Amino acid sequence: MQITITGQHLDLTDSIKNYADEKIGRLGRYFDHVSNAQVVLKHLPHEKLSNVVDITVNAPGHVFHAEVHDADMYTGID
């Protein structure tokens, strides 16, 4: 599975990239044919829940999408 992790309005550290890669990589345990996943991590400084995690997972015949707003980026990834 190919995982693409990008950031908007924040500096992506190796720690956050590795954490997201590890968590999204676990999808392979549940879905055999996941082809790729796009993870977009955003920081919105003027919002109460300022971190946004947007994940899109592609599998043959299906597209799964989730978006979470949270005060903590790691919690949002979970």
Swiss-Prot record:
Q: Where in the sequence is the signal peptide annotated?
A: none
Is Cell membrane a UniProt keyword of this protein?
no
What Gene Ontology terms describe what this protein does at the molecular function level?
ribosomal small subunit binding
Q: Which UniProt keywords apply?
A: Translation regulation
The UniProt entry, under Pfam families, shows: Ribosomal_S30AE
UniProt keyword Iron present: no
InterPro entries hit by this protein: HPF/YfiA_ribosome-assoc, RHF-like, RHF/RaiA
Listed GO cellular component terms? cytosolic small ribosomal subunit
Q: Alphabetically, which GO biological process terms does the record hold?
A: negative regulation of translational elongation
Task: Check the record and name the CDD domains matching this protein.
Answer: RaiA
Q: What does this protein do?
A: Required for dimerization of active 70S ribosomes into 100S ribosomes in stationary phase; 100S ribosomes are translationally inactive and sometimes present during exponential growth.
Q: Which family does it belong to?
A: Belongs to the HPF/YfiA ribosome-associated protein family. Long HPF subfamily.
- What is the name attached to this protein's record? Ribosome hibernation promoting factor
Q: What's the encoding gene here? A: hpf
